[in-house]
Amino acid sequence: MKPDVHIIGAGLIGLSTADSLLDRGERVVIWDRAPAPGMGASFSNGSLLHPSQAAPWIVDGLSEDLDEATRDELTANGLELAARSGDRVTRRISELGLPARKLGVMQVFNTSEARDARLEAYARMGTLAEPSDWFGHSAINIPGDSMADARAYSARLAEDLAERGAEFRMCADVGLAESGRGLVITCGAERETVGRIVVAAGNATAKLIKGLGLDLPVMGVAGHALSFLRNDDLADLPAVMHADSRSAMTVLGREVRLSGTVGLDSPGDLLPIWRELVPDLIEELGQPRRAWTGHRPCTPDGRPIMGPTPIDGLYVNTGHAHMGWTLCAGAGELVAEDVVAGRAHTPSRDAEMVPAR
């Protein structure tokens, strides 16, 4: 009998990896440092499923050095994985009995020139995009993007995994080591030797495997959110992305959520951005009921790191940045396929595992 597959990380990426492994007949044990699944970057993000945003982010100034051909290649790869992921997550949303995706996302710009330039970029990507207007701002309607509650999905998916036989072990100091017998998961003084491990612990992945001699170019970039109680007249508010600040406004059940990452020091920094865009709407929302900060796992070139490592039996699935919800189901499938096939790391994949990638 094959040994269980142990997954460290119970966020969207780890849960989705477990989901695909169970589909393939594997037994799964899921570890996390939080007291419950989905408590990290999956907890309060903008919940946008947005393949249109597959272009690599500029992180730590390094992505600016990518030439146009490389950026186009990375964008195409992201779009391909997003398409695969979208098909699966749509099916799983239905199977899990969750509300269907809310189709269509509006993207607003500070100037019409910026809007027109983005329309040209979307045309090159093959992304359907229509010029529009939102509260007097130049905008683009993106019919292929959508919204669904990422937190609700992770909670329901975790329940489903448990019902199908997955075992959850919550340990505040879960760690990873090596012994003469193989890989070892530690929890306090307890040690368990395991045969196959997927580390999908977001930005903590790099720290977890560093003791094994592996350096991953993964850094945590703070993401912030403010949640407001929604008035009834805002039920039909569309999901909106603000291009210049890379922030978003979404309606999730009885909440309106502002979320964003780049250039923000705290959740409160979201308010002046959206107060300038839609002052009357922000005034109507009143005081936020909850503020949240999490850390998205980002890589310098915007490309996630997925698959086998040079250590036999050790796999990683991380670095999805702002695309974690959009890519989780497809990324989980890809890594599950690697694990089931027992694929080994090869020299051609070394670039996936070193900071100079």
What is each stretch, according to the model?
Residues 3-30:
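N-terminal Rossmann-like FAD-binding beta1-loop-alpha1 element of flavoenzymes
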